[in-house]
Amino acid sequence: MSTDKKQDESIAEKDWKVELSEQEYYVCREAGTERPFTGVLLDEQRDGLYVCKCCEAPLFPSDTKFDAGCGWPSFYKQLDDGNVDYREDVSHGMRRVEIFCKQCGSHLGHVFPDGPAPTGQRYCVNSLSMTFKGEDNVEVKG
């Protein structure tokens, strides 16, 4: 096996192309964004946990989800585990903070400083980047 990190990463990306649908790959691995109001998890209201679609790292508890009216699932707080990583995004002539899964590097969405109390944060997350695991043991993939 190669010890060249770049080569190992490209092999991993090949694997993601097999594991994910074309749209999931675009959102999760190429930092794309799904169209607003199209995500399966936007209207999910049950109690449970939102996890990373790619590695199942726990991301957001359902009790921090709120309707921001923006067209994507929104949360005001990540789990205390800290599986969300932050990077500056200056694409499209804007300055934003992009969020990724800290465990596998999967793109999640963006965080904005216009959310509700108690944090004032709005984690705006693509449904395609998450799986919902309900307390009723029903799983919904975004």
UniProtKB/Swiss-Prot annotation:
GO terms for cellular component: cytoplasm. The active site is at residue 124. PANTHER family: METHIONINE SULFOXIDE REDUCTASE, METHIONINE-R-SULFOXIDE REDUCTASE B1. Its EC number is 1.8.4.12. It catalyses: L-methionyl-[protein] + [thioredoxin]-disulfide + H2O = L-methionyl-(R)-S-oxide-[protein] + [thioredoxin]-dithiol. Binds 1 zinc ion per subunit. The zinc ion is important for the structural integrity of the protein. One of its GO terms (molecular function) is zinc ion binding. The keyword Transmembrane does not apply. One of its GO terms (biological process) is response to oxidative stress. It comes from Alteromonas mediterranea (strain DSM 17117 / CIP 110805 / LMG 28347 / Deep ecotype). Zn(2+) binds at residues 52, 55, 101, 104. Pfam families: SelR (PF01641). This is Peptide methionine sulfoxide reductase MsrB. Belongs to the MsrB Met sulfoxide reductase family. Keywords: Metal-binding, Oxidoreductase, Zinc. Its cofactor is Zn(2+). The lineage of its organism: Bacteria, Pseudomonadati, Pseudomonadota, Gammaproteobacteria, Alteromonadales. Residues 13-135 form the MsrB domain. The keyword Lipid biosynthesis does not apply. It is an enzyme of class 1 (oxidoreductase).
